[in-house]
Structures are given as structure tokens and as C-alpha cells.
Design a protein with these regions (language model features):
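Helix-loop-helix junctions within predominantly alpha-helical proteins
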Residues: 2-65, 97-190, 196-219, 243, ...
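Transmembrane alpha-helix/interfacial motif
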Residues: 60-81
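Short intracellular "coupling" helices and adjacent cytoplasmic loop segments at the cytosolic face
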Residues: 77-82, 88, 99-103, 204-219, ...
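Inner-leaflet juxtamembrane helices
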Residues: 77-95, 187-191, 195, 287-309
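Short amphipathic alpha-helical coupling elements at transmembrane boundaries
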Residues: 90-97, 196, 200-203, 207, ...
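Hydrophobic alpha-helical transmembrane segments of multi-pass membrane transport/permease proteins
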Residues: 131, 249-256
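C-terminal transmembrane module of eukaryotic multi-pass membrane proteins
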Residues: 186, 242, 264-268, 274, ...
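Intracellular effector-coupling site of seven-transmembrane GPCRs
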Residues: 216-251, 322, 327-329
Length: 370
């Protein structure tokens, strides 16, 4: 079974390979910023421009929204890696101060590693679904004579230009696959790490119940220091993904709404039907990864306060221990929430609300089209 450090190295390698990491070679950064980013921005402009020619064609409008949400996934992840590069590096460095999984025995460590492996496999499933979507889009553009590009956008009549745009779209979609793997893996690993550290912290507090006064006091100081470290890492992680959460919320509503509309109200080819189904599942999995993990941390942080109460601080005669416990309890009682732009609370309830909203909007669009 891999060590806990292997999971961190996995993230570092992906960020390095994106060309936007602190250790990425200059030529990779040049390719990412001076070639791939302008291509993505150009394709976004062509998609937005094509809205002028929808002419009340609801299917074309839906496909353009799908294209726009797809490029939104690319640009927001580039934004994170470019703007929050230093904060990401700080988080990765702080991760080195986390407690080892083996702190409370090898059996407990193996359980924690399985938690991490499960989370990473969920990310791999997400990347696999995105890859399937890209293949479906490319297949659809080949088999459907009416489609000249994988993603709907404004297309000139010139065949040579169409070939160039096709190549650009394929390059962008390959980059989307890689960046989803990179950014989402970083988030999943760090959130799961924070959750695991809260589990270790609770285990440490349980072990202090039978300790002598001096040993208990030293243990409490260690717990408080580690708790403050986790709060700091969580705050930085929320800072990195705050804009992403907000954009992802609306992009996911948009993407789910479009796919639900296509599935419910439009007769499409087998390729388009398959693509819509995979796309919808991918959106569900992707949003679940972000919202569920944030909610897990929130719940673990709430349970920490109960563990502090169970240390039986009221019966101790040492005022230093009581003071340390009260200080830690005050911090633990503050809700540890993830927020998107200070507006969207990232948790399970909001996850359900998101898809209810998408379903409602798609139903309204269907009623309007009829």
C-alpha cells in the first residue's frame, strides 16, 4: 500500500506537468500561457459570437451553452493555477507538517490510506468520464455531417480554417482532461488529508483521557498546535477554490440544465444521446467530489468539539489543562465551512439544491419551447 507521502508527490507531479507549477520548466509555462491559453480564449470568443446566429434554434442554443460550460472548466482551472500558485505551494509545504498515518498503529494507518485511495479513484473515474465525453464529441463530429467541430461554435466556410479550428478544439479538450485531473486531484487529496488529520486529532484526544497531568498538558498543547495548522490549511484551500466554487456552481447548473433539456425534449442521434448521458453523470460526479468532501470536513470539525468535551476538563484540578481545553473548544465550535465567493455554502444540501435548480430550469425551457 502506498505511503501518505506518495499521494502528495502525485499532486506535485501533475501540477508540474501542467506548465503552471513553481517547478515547471520555462518552455512548458510558455506553451501553457502563450499558446494554449490564447487558443482557449479565442474559442470562447467564437462560441459567444455564435450566439448571434441561434435564430431561436433551441438545440443550437443548448449546444452553445454546452460548449461555453466546457471551456469554462478549462479557464477557471488555469485561473486557479496562475493566480493562486504561491498559495498552492504554501499548502503543499504545510502538508509536510501533518501527522503520519502510522501515529496510532499500522491497522489504523491502512484504514486511512484506503480512505485516500478511494478518494483518488473517484477523481480517476471523473477523468475517465471526461475522456469519454471528449471521445463522444470527436466521434459525433466525424459521423454527423452537419457538425464540423466537436464543440459548437462559429465556423467559417473555409475548409482550411475549419481544420485549424478542429485542431485547436482537440488541443483544448486534451488540456481540459489534464487540468481536471490536476486541479481536482489537488483538491481531493488535500480535503481528504484534512479529514484524515481530524480523525487522528480525535484519536489523540481520546488517548489523553488516561494520561498524567504533565503528559496530558503537553499532549493538549500538541493538539492545539495541530488544530490551528488544520484551520490554516483549510482557510488557504478555501481561498484557492473560492472563485472556482462560485463559477463551478453556475457552470454545473448550466451544463446539467442543457443535458436534461436535450434528454427530455430533443430527439438526438445515438452518439449525442450517449454524450449527454455521460456528460450529465460527469457533472454529478464532479460536483459531488467538491461538495461532499467539503461537507465531510465540516462534520469532522463539528465532532471534534464533542471529543474535547469527553476529555472531562471540568473535573481536572489543573487550571492550565482547563485553559488549554477551553481555548481549543472555542476554536472547534466555530463552523469550518467552504464558501464559493462568500455566497455559496459548499455542502451536501447545496449539492441537492443545485440539481433541483437545473431540473426546474430545463423544465421551464421545455415548456417555453412547446
Amino acid at each position: 500500500m502506498p505511503s501518505d507521502q506518495d499521494f502528495l508527490d502525485f499532486c506535485r507531479k501533475l501540477i508540474h506537468g501542467s506548465g503552471l507549477g513553481p517547478t515547471s520548466p520555462s518552455y512548458m509555462r510558455l506553451i501553457s500561457l502563450c499558446i494554449l491559453l490564447p487558443i482557449a480564449l479565442l474559442m470562447d470568443c467564437l462560441i459567444i459570437y455564435d450566439f448571434v446566429y441561434t435564430k431561436n434554434d433551441i438545440f443550437k442554443f443548448a449546444e452553445l451553452l454546452e460548449s461555453l460550460s466546457s471551456y469554462g472548466q478549462l479557464l477557471i482551472r488555469k485561473f486557479i493555477l496562475i493566480v493562486h500558485e504561491k498559495v498552492i505551494q504554501e499548502v503543499l509545504e504545510l502538508r509536510k507538517n501533518f501527522w503520519k498515518y502510522e501515529t496510532f498503529g499500522e491497522e489504523h494507518a491502512n484504514y486511512l490510506r484506503r480512505e485516500m485511495i478511494t478518494a483518488i479513484r473517484a477523481t480517476q473515474i471523473m477523468v475517465g468520464l471526461v475522456t469519454m465525453i471528449v471521445l463522444c464529441l470527436c466521434l459525433s463530429s466525424i459521423t454527423n455531417k452537419e457538425k464540423s467541430l466537436p464543440l459548437e461554435s462559429w465556423t467559417p466556410e473555409n475548409e482550411s480554417v475549419k481544420c485549424v479550428l478542429y485542431t485547436m478544439q482537440v488541443m483544448s479538450m486534451i488540456e481540459v482532461i489534464y487540468l481536471i485531473g490536476t486541479v481536482d486531484s489537488f483538491y481531493v487529496v488535500m480535503c481528504t488529508e484534512i479529514k484524515i488529520q481530524f480523525l487522528l486529532l480525535k484519536e489523540k484526544l481520546r488517548s489523553l483521557r488516561s494520561k498524567e497531568t504533565i503528559e496530558c498538558l503537553n499532549g493538549l498543547k500538541t493538539c492545539i498546535k495541530h488544530h490551528n495548522l488544520l484551520l490554516s490549511v483549510h482557510k488557504k484551500l478555501n481561498r484557492i477554490f473560492s472563485e472556482y466554487f462560485l463559477v463551478q456552481y453556475f457552470v454545473s447548473v448550466l451544463a446539467a440544465c442543457v443535458q436534461l433539456y436535450i434528454l427530455k425534449y430533443i430527439t438526438v442521434s445515438l452518439e449525442d444521446l450517449l454524450k449527454s448521458l455521460v456528460y450529465l453523470v460527469a457533472v454529478f460526479v464532479q460536483v459531488a467530489l467538491f461538495f461532499m468532501l467539503a461537507s465531510d470536513i465540516e462534520e469532522e470539525a463539528e465532532q471534534l468539539a464533542d471529543e474535547i468535551y469527553d476529555v472531562d476538563w471540568e473535573s481536572t484540578s489543573d487550571p492550565k489543562i482547563r485553559k488549554q481545553l477551553l481555548f481549543m473548544l472555542m476554536r472547534a465550535q466555530e463552523p469550518l465551512c467552504m464558501w464559493g465567493g462568500g455566497m455559496v455554502h459548499i455542502n451536501r444540501n447545496e449539492y441537492i439544491v443545485l440539481f433541483r435548480l437545473a431540473f426546474s430550469v430545463s423544465t421551464l425551457l421545455g415548456a417555453k419551447a412547446e
